[in-house]
Regions:
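Acyl-donor-binding surface of acyltransferase catalytic domains
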Residues: 65-144
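Residues that form generic nucleotide/phosphate-binding pockets
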Residues: 19, 37, 90, 114, ...
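Short amphipathic alpha-helix that is part of the acyltransferase structural core
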Residues: 1-30, 137-173
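Conserved donor-binding loop and adjoining core beta-sheet/short helix segment
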Residues: 4-5, 24, 32-94
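Short, well-ordered alpha-helical segments in soluble proteins
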Residues: 115, 119, 162-169, 187
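Active-site rim helix/loop that mediates acceptor-substrate recognition in acyltransferases
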Residues: 26-45, 170-188
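An N-terminal domain-start capping segment
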Residues: 7-36, 40, 100-115
Length: 188
C-alpha cells in the first residue's frame, strides 16, 4: 500500500475524475474544489493524491486545500482501514496541517482515531451531514406574498445569517463586522 501524490491539479483530475464522477453526489465538493484549482500546481497549502493497494487499485482519494477541511473518498464498498491509517501517517510525516475532515462517517472516525494517536490533536464534530441526491423535481406553487430587495434596515439580520451560514457550511467563524461590511456592499 502506498500514497501517490500529484504535482499539479491537472494530473490529479486526469487520473481521478472518472472515478470520482461514478459517485458524483458524494464527491461534489471534492470535484468542484479540484476543478476550480485545475490550473494550479500543488504547494504547501494544496495537497492531492490517492492511496493504492498492492494490486494498484485505488483505496482512497484525498484533497487538502488549506484552510479548508481535508476531503477524502473511497470508491470501495468497504473502508480500507490501512489506507486511512497510511493517509494519516503521510500527513503527519510531511507536516501537512489539516483543519478538519469531510468524508463519510466511517472514514472520518477511522482517520480521527489514527490521527489523534499520531498528533494528540482534538477533534470536535461541528457539522454532521447526510448527502442526498436529487432525482426528481416537482413543480410547486409559490406562497402568496411580496418579495423585495434587502435594505440597510435588514443589515443586522443578514449579517447574522451570513455568519451562521459560514459556520454551518465551512466551519469557519466570521467576525460580525466583516460580515456586516460584506452584506452592506451587497445591499448597496
Amino acid at each position: 500500500m502506498k500514497v501517490i501524490t500529484y504535482s499539479s491539479m491537472k494530473d490529479f483530475i486526469d487520473d481521478t475524475l472518472e472515478l470520482l464522477l461514478k459517485d458524483e453526489a458524494v464527491n461534489q465538493l471534492l470535484i468542484f474544489t479540484a476543478l476550480s484549482k485545475k490550473d494550479l500546481a500543488t504547494n504547501d497549502t494544496l495537497h492531492v493524491g490517492k492511496v493504492i493497494d498492492e494490486n494498484n487499485e485505488v483505496s482512497l482519494i484525498f484533497l487538502n486545500s488549506q484552510p479548508y477541511n481535508l476531503l477524502a473518498y473511497t470508491p470501495n464498498e468497504t473502508i480500507n482501514v490501512d489506507a486511512v491509517k497510511l493517509l494519516a501517517e503521510y500527513l503527519v510525516n510531511n507536516n501537512i496541517r489539516i483543519y478538519g475532515i469531510n468524508a463519510c462517517k466511517t472514514i472520518s472516525e477511522t482517520f480521527i482515531r489514527y490521527y489523534k494517536k499520531l498528533t494528540k490533536a482534538n477533534f470536535t464534530e461541528r457539522l454532521a451531514m447526510d448527502i442526498m441526491e436529487l432525482s426528481e423535481v416537482n413543480d410547486i406553487i409559490l406562497p402568496e406574498g411580496n418579495f423585495r430587495q434587502a435594505t440597510l434596515e435588514d443589515l443586522p439580520l443578514l449579517s447574522r445569517w451570513f455568519c451562521q451560514f459560514s459556520l454551518d457550511a465551512t466551519s469557519e467563524l466570521i467576525d460580525i463586522s466583516i460580515a456586516s461590511s460584506f452584506m452592506k456592499e451587497k445591499i448597496s
